[in-house]
UniProtKB/Swiss-Prot annotation:
<dbReference type="InterPro" id="IPR011335">
    <property type="entry name" value="Restrct_endonuc-II-like"/>
</dbReference>
<comment type="similarity">
    <text>Belongs to the UPF0102 family.</text>
</comment>
<protein>
    <recommendedName>
        <fullName>UPF0102 protein DehaBAV1_0707</fullName>
    </recommendedName>
</protein>
<dbReference type="Pfam" id="PF02021">
    <property type="entry name" value="UPF0102"/>
</dbReference>
<dbReference type="InterPro" id="IPR003509">
    <property type="entry name" value="UPF0102_YraN-like"/>
</dbReference>
<dbReference type="InterPro" id="IPR011856">
    <property type="entry name" value="tRNA_endonuc-like_dom_sf"/>
</dbReference>
<dbReference type="GO" id="GO:0003676">
    <property type="term" value="F:nucleic acid binding"/>
</dbReference>
Length: 121
């Protein structure tokens, strides 16, 4: 099991990618770095190009993983997604931002997918 913050995040992202594949997503890219920020996972779900933010927690004392996405982080996610779309000329694809919540507080990891987490497409 991962111990420090970076390792915990990387572990959660690997779990999330496998989880998403099992849900029918195709993984296009992971850890995509852009001037506006990082996109954890870029994938495709049917016709949708999907930008996925993975939130992993080992303890839930401060709330659920998805609750840790601040308004500032949401703004960075949207800006990063727009930058990715422009950089790769993908304006013709419908897009959305999903969250994957990874809870490592139990013996078995629990994952939850929140589709269209920001409510905009």
């Amino acid at each position: 099991m991962a111990y420090n913050r970076k390792e915990t995040g990387e572990f959660g992202e690997k779990l999330a990618a496998e989880y998403l594949k099992g849900m029918g997503y195709s993984i296009i890219q992971t850890n995509c770095r852009l001037p506006e920020g990082e996109i954890d996972i870029v994938g495709q779900d049917g016709e949708y190009l999907v930008f996925i933010e993975v939130r992993t927690k080992r303890r839930l004392g401060y709330g659920l993983p998805a609750e840790s996405v601040t308004p500032r982080k949401k703004a960075h996610l949207m800006a990063s997604a727009e930058s990715y779309i422009q950089k790769h000329r993908l304006e013709h694809f419908p897009c959305r931002i999903d969250f994957v919540s990874v809870d490592l507080s139990q013996p078995e990891p629990r994952l939850e997918l929140i589709k269209n987490a920001l409510g905009e497409e």
